[in-house]
Amino acid sequence: MPLNREDKQAVVAEVAAQVAKAQTVVLAEYRGIAVGDLTKLRAQAREKQVYLRVLKNTLARRAVEGTPFAPLAEQMTGPLIYGISEDAIAAAKVVNDFSKSNDKLVIKAGSFDGKVMDKAGVQALASIPSREELLSKLLFVMQSPVSGFARALAALAEKKQAEAA
């Protein structure tokens, strides 16, 4: 059933609201993907707080008009699924990971920080560790010298006690 004008305006407004908050937009062609596989992709996207939507390209073009993602409009051809996320890496990671296991999902383009990326750029962005991973690595690096120092002090204290006894 075709969308009437009000429905189209509502879709554009919804997507524009997501795009306004987004740091990353990823476009992927989904020709020939089974419904079950698309459902799995959507579930993975929900877990990572990625807004994933199949849209008419004309509606998507209107939604990105006047935003840093406007240059992506040139790439909006064919049957596309749009991944939009506030996290700089999440959309690229979700789409890239799924495309590895399902060759019918083909990454077409993406945009991050006002720059349009090709497939290789999206894959490079997806290979960056997530914010949580980076924070845990930083915490580990910061704790290592402190815990080593604490162990050295404990060993010194034990040695002094052994000498005193």
UniProtKB/Swiss-Prot annotation:
HAMAP family per the record?
Ribosomal_uL10 (MF_00362)
User: InterPro entries under this entry?
Assistant: Ribosomal_uL10 (IPR001790), Ribosomal_uL10-like_sf (IPR043141), Ribosomal_uL10_bac (IPR022973), Ribosomal_uL10_bac_type (IPR047865)
Name its GO BP terms in alphabetical order: translation
Q: Which keywords has UniProt assigned to this entry?
A: Ribonucleoprotein, Ribosomal protein, RNA-binding, rRNA-binding
Molecular function terms from GO: large ribosomal subunit rRNA binding
**A Pfam family in this protein?**
Ribosomal_L10
Assigned GO CC terms? ribonucleoprotein complex; ribosome
Tell me how this protein assembles. Answer: Part of the ribosomal stalk of the 50S ribosomal subunit. The N-terminus interacts with L11 and the large rRNA to form the base of the stalk. The C-terminus forms an elongated spine to which L12 dimers bind in a sequential fashion forming a multimeric L10(L12)X complex.
Q: Does the keyword RNA-binding apply?
A: yes
Q: Does the keyword S-adenosyl-L-methionine apply?
A: no
Q: Which family is it part of? A: Belongs to the universal ribosomal protein uL10 family.
Known function: Forms part of the ribosomal stalk, playing a central role in the interaction of the ribosome with GTP-bound translation factors.
Q: Which residues form the signal peptide?
A: none
Domain of life of the source = Bacteria
**CDD domains under this entry?**
Ribosomal_L10
Name of the protein in its database record: Large ribosomal subunit protein uL10
